[in-house]
Amino acid sequence: MMEKKFIDSLQEIEEIEKSTPVEEFIPFKSTYEAIYDSAMSHSDKTAISFFLSGDDYKNSIEVTYKDLISNITRTANFFHSLGLREDDTVAFVLPNLPETHYVLWGAEAACRVFAVNSLLDAEKIRELVNATEAKAVVTMAPIIGSDLWEKVSSIATELYHTRFLIGVDITHYVPSFPETMKAEINEKIRVNMELLENIEYFDLVHEIREIDGEQLKFDRTYQEDTVSSMFCTGGTTGLPKIAQRTHRNEIFDASAVKTFSQEVFNSEAVILAGVPLFHVTGALATGLVSFMSGGSLVMTTPSGYRGQNVFSQIWNIVEHYRVTAMIGVPTVYAHLLNIPLTGQDISSLEYCMCGSAPFPTALYREFANYIDAEVIEAYGLTEGTCISSGTPPGIKEKIGSIGLR
């Protein structure tokens, strides 16, 4: 285990701020460079463990750091091959998949990315995609149990700037998936696409398999104000508002979180990742911060914590992967109080991070007493990249008051 390096006073934080030039928190020009650097140091280490349902937690798909950066590179090169450049936008309407990370960080490398809440109805998706003038939209290929293809393909003729519709076929995660059903999926895609003019369809999994993953096939200059991503803000009524962020924003935020929470995010960490990747917490906390730290993510199904039998198997998952930290929202932790421990060894779980909504004091105390792990509250907003303030690990009596200032 790594030595604890608690930052436990405002004075210590102020000393770090005074003595550390801001550029030390921004050691890379792009998020691609940041992930690439970590991948070179942890190439054979597991970056992602992914399973399709809670009951399949012992049969995970393992993605090493070498695989991760290779697939991100392939995806970036694929987008570039479509003619997408730095001012163009790739929108994704996807659940939590390894491919979602490839699209997210690959698009940031080649152009810019727009994360769309996959739970929104088709009309809202249409308005948001048109607002960003996305030239490519990535979504799920048709498959039983998901309505994403139906939603996105139904509005394709009304996506006025979109030239490419890209499907993610996850049947490769199911070796026993019937060939007849794959044929039905391909036929459904063919029929849908014949109805569309001026839009080309690509199968992402197939396309990137054929592309070089050793290095980017293009040169790009990243300025301080180069936009990396667009995410929708939370907590608003009506259509979500779209916030632009830069590579500089994302690298600084990830570096700062990594520095001030070294006990949580480090190369020995195993993070339970159930927050959606269309949310900044999912993308940064269970994405960029973990990757830059060389830690491992356990992706709990395409639907995250909402996935089939994830909650009923949660303590088995923690025990099996020796999870060291999990990230969730108050409703997740409230639900976990109803999941009994039945002899599982969850002693590896040291930290439970909570954000997105206030953590009720009574729930905080009840959960902290239920399991022997430290609850860490964080506050942030999409416009501020992700985490803006957090109570450092080791500070146990700051319930309801986030940070030390």
What are the language-model segments listed below?
Residues 44, 48-97, 101-104, 121-126, ...:
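Conserved AMP-binding/adenylate-forming core of the ANL superfamily
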Residues 20-30, 179-227:
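Flexible, low-complexity linker/hinge segments
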Residues 91-93, 100, 104, 108-143, ...:
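Short beta-strand->loop structural element characteristic of the AMP-binding/adenylate-forming
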Residues 108, 251-273, 278-324:
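Conserved AMP-binding/adenylation subdomain of ANL enzymes
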Residues 3-7, 25-51, 70:
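A short N-terminal helical cap/helix-turn-helix that marks the beginning
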Residues 79-84, 208-225, 230-275, 295:
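Conserved adenylate-forming
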